[in-house]
Amino acid sequence: MAITAAASRLGTEPF
């Protein structure tokens, strides 16, 4: 998912 890709960059899950 796109969320996983974004989280990979930030190093945290933006939930």
UniProtKB/Swiss-Prot annotation:
Gene Ontology biological-process annotations: photosynthesis
Keyword tRNA-binding assigned: no
Intracellular or extracellular location(s): Cellular thylakoid membrane
Protein keywords: Antenna complex, Membrane, Photosynthesis, Phycobilisome, Thylakoid
Superkingdom: Bacteria
UniProt topology in membrane: Peripheral membrane protein
Protein name as annotated: Phycobilisome 32.1 kDa linker polypeptide, phycocyanin-associated, rod
Gene: cpcC
